[in-house]
Amino acid sequence: ATLYETVPRAVTFDPTAGYSATTVGGAIKIDGVPLSSGTGGNTTASGKLQAMVQLRDSTATTMQSQLDEIARGLISAFAETDPSGTGALPDTPGLFTWPGAPAMPADGTLVPGLAGLIKVNPAMDSTVGGSASVLRDGGAGGAGYVANASGAASYSDLLIRYSQNLDKPIAFDP
């Protein structure tokens, strides 16, 4: 295809082999001039390339950040807390964990790529030697976090708290 008049313009692209949550895409250049992206929800892009650059550099990165914040919310909602209520033990990841454990991701702070890093806590995963009863009883963070010391099968306080945590609003990094 011919861009501009009758002489084909040189369109170049600096390729990127793979994209992580923090990768900045390579520039698209026409005659050596970087192509700017469109802006806004009703895009200002005046062509398919500008719209694609906007999608890659703005829309997709916003969606990635939103997924990362949802992942942080899950880690926080299912966190184990000090069962004594004294606050002597810090909160620690419960059902969902991440590479920064035993610390919790900071509230209201974006952790780029977190959605791709969270996993089910091995303490609760029977396929790797854990037990699903740890979700009901507590203890993924160690013996100090066990809330159901008797092991009663009808104990549901933690499960109810997790459900209530999912209903709470959380602060997202803008």
PLM regions: where:
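S/T-rich, low-complexity, solvent-exposed segments of bacterial secretion/appendage proteins
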Residues: 1-174
